[in-house]
């Protein structure tokens, strides 16, 4: 039986601005997304029977049709029934390293890896654009997870404009295992508190989305100026999440106070918080200091870095 092993990186938001509502119930967003080298491993094996099996080493991750990984495989079966009949089903194993329900696109990047893996397994020859379009039907972050690197994302997050990739900005990432923030709750509360500021006119929305391309954070990214990037981190959802989750606020403040940290922010709807550092040694020192200050085993702390790619194939059999 043929098989592929893939690496599925997590993402952080360097910028997240909510600019309006969409007719489909989502929000109009302006984001800058960044791949990091904290990643899950996905193994995909072909099966002789026309079935889908999903396995995962993390007890919180379901392996039924509620899992985005399963739905990604199901999507490929639906779109390419002849290939499914010819090549058979798939057995998918997810080795989780990315924290679950953390605002790091763990589920989305796993789904992206399944799309890439099945494309290879069934010899479909899909382009990256075609894979991104398939991914957009599964979730807003999936197209980015296929592409990876450093990207401006607009619409609900599926319209991507690549930026020069950032490599080797070091990151300390913290997340309480037992703490989850509902993405739907965060956006709903933001709408309730700040919906009056939303842009309504289609041209205004398009202009605001386009404006980020000439903004100061994009200039800093193009110039690979880590300090300038760190000074321009922005996430609208912090306005509703931080007041409601004091643990997240405290962790953010603690990270921000550490020597060597050049910027701190919550990723996505949280509860993950990250700090940017210019060197690995600084990041490791910050991790050690925060661990001493908060010895709670419920707090996961990672040292990671920015990377230039999305899904990677690392083995086949």
Curated annotation (Swiss-Prot):
Domain of life: Bacteria
Keyword Lyase: no
Catalytically driven reaction(s): 4-CDP-2-C-methyl-D-erythritol + ATP = 4-CDP-2-C-methyl-D-erythritol 2-phosphate + ADP + H(+)
Keyword Magnesium: no
Keywords of the record: ATP-binding, Isoprene biosynthesis, Kinase, Nucleotide-binding, Transferase
Amino acids binding ATP: 99-109
Pathway the protein takes part in: Isoprenoid biosynthesis; isopentenyl diphosphate biosynthesis via DXP pathway; isopentenyl diphosphate from 1-deoxy-D-xylulose 5-phosphate: step 3/6
GO molecular function: 4-(cytidine 5'-diphospho)-2-C-methyl-D-erythritol kinase activity; ATP binding
Any GO BP annotation: terpenoid biosynthetic process
Active site, renumbered: 11, 141
A Pfam family it matches: GHMP_kinases_N
Its biological purpose: Catalyzes the phosphorylation of the position 2 hydroxy group of 4-diphosphocytidyl-2C-methyl-D-erythritol.
NCBIfam families cross-referenced by the UniProt entry: ispE (TIGR00154)
Family assignment from sequence similarity: Belongs to the GHMP kinase family. IspE subfamily.
Protein name, UniProt field: 4-diphosphocytidyl-2-C-methyl-D-erythritol kinase
Natural source organism: Nostoc sp. (strain PCC 7120 / SAG 25.82 / UTEX 2576)
